[in-house]
Amino acid sequence: MSDIILDSKSFQSAVSKISREISDNNKNIREVAIIGIQNKGVFLAKRILAEIAKLAGIGRSLIPFGTLDITLYRDDLDDLGSKIPVIKDTVIPFDTSRKNIILIDDVLYTGRTVRAALDVLMDFGRPKSIQLAVLIDRGFRELPIEAKYIGIRYQSEELIKVECKETDGVDRVTFIK
């Protein structure tokens, strides 16, 4: 059984809210680069990139875009036992130095995914800044990590499922009981 936290309309509203806030807080859009954390963060990042480019009145290709996989940087690899994690692509085809990196993921919970993402990102250089954007902030942090841009706050230790049109055919966030 599941309860809907965000339907398609409120999902898009949350993405638009994040996009506007990023645009408002980064007046020099030429210094911004967008990086999505695999998997769902990449799809959200592409949407946010499109909205930011539209707000700035420029083409999407003028804002650097990358994808980041944290698999090899996870702090729980030993706990996975014989389960072999699937490694996705990390593609950052631009110099991260002197860029305000907008790091995007679907859910912020313990902070461990973001910690791993920061480790990966620092291997690519020293950005001017790193700003975290998430669709859902669940609270219950285990590490001192906070998002600057949040679609919605939904404090819960229960499982949350994020579905995106690109992979699931629908935009929706549900609380799984």
Curated annotation (Swiss-Prot):
Enzyme class, first EC level, given as a word: transferase
- Which UniProt keywords are listed? Glycosyltransferase, Transcription, Transcription regulation, Transferase
Gene3D superfamilies given in the database record: 3.40.50.2020
Reactions the enzyme catalyzes: UMP + diphosphate = 5-phospho-alpha-D-ribose 1-diphosphate + uracil
Q: Name one GO molecular function term.
A: uracil phosphoribosyltransferase activity
- Under Enzyme Commission nomenclature, its number is 2.4.2.9
Extract the CDD domains matched here: PRTases_typeI
Which residues are listed as membrane-spanning? none
Instruction: Give the location of motif PRPP-binding in residue numbers.
Output: 101-113
Q: Name one GO biological process term.
A: regulation of DNA-templated transcription
Family membership noted in the UniProt record:
Belongs to the purine/pyrimidine phosphoribosyltransferase family. PyrR subfamily.
Function recorded in the entry:
Regulates the transcription of the pyrimidine nucleotide (pyr) operon in response to exogenous pyrimidines. Also displays a weak uracil phosphoribosyltransferase activity which is not physiologically significant.
Q: Which PANTHER family match?
A: BIFUNCTIONAL PROTEIN PYRR (PTHR11608:SF0)
Q: What is this protein called?
A: Bifunctional protein PyrR
Species of origin reads Endomicrobium trichonymphae
